[in-house]
Design a protein with these regions (language model features):
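Small cysteine-rich, disulfide-bonded extracellular modules of the LU/uPAR three-finger superfamily
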Residues: 1-104, 109-147
Length: 147
């Protein structure tokens, strides 16, 4: 089963930027949230991902690590075709005494703990975090693809 390109774009717009997905059911379509809220972005230490689990599944625990929030709006994200990209850099805390090798990312519901994990993906290259290393996604580098 597959969705059309236009529906993939509409779904990403609704989920990532809180923009209505028009013409689903009626002209108004699937409506946005009254309050857009944020996604909490996490970093993971395991290659590949499982669709089971929560935000803590394979989440890194390097010294000083914390999830970072990103608003669900068109100021923070751009949706083009089947891909959503971050419009601004997303920085994480600088590594401390204990490090980790990062393989992936997640978008979820909670600032900490076992929140809902909505979207998972792999980094384009692994990143070894140690003391003084600051993980980040440059603007346009975090791709969420609906294909």
């Amino acid at each position: 089963m597959s969705a059309s390109n236009s529906f993939e774009t509409a779904l990403l717009g609704l989920i990532i930027t809180n923009v209505d997905a028009a013409n689903v059911g009626d002209a108004a379509g699937l409506q946005n949230s009254a309050t857009a809220g944020v996604f909490w972005i996490s970093l993971t230490v395991s290659p590949g991902h499982t669709e089971a689990g929560d935000q803590t599944t394979n989440e890194t625990a390097y010294t000083n690590y914390a999830r970072q929030d990103e608003a669900r709006n068109t100021t923070q994200w751009t949706v083009t075709n089947d891909t959503a990209d971050n419009d601004n850099a997303i920085g994480f805390p600088t590594g401390g005494a204990s490090g980790a090798t990062l393989f992936g990312f997640g978008l979820g519901s909670d600032t900490s703990g076992a929140g809902n994990l909505f979207i998972i993906g792999d980094l384009t290259a692994t990143l070894a975090v140690s003391s003084g290393i600051t993980p980040s996604f440059a603007a346009g580098a975090l791709d969420v693809v609906c294909a």
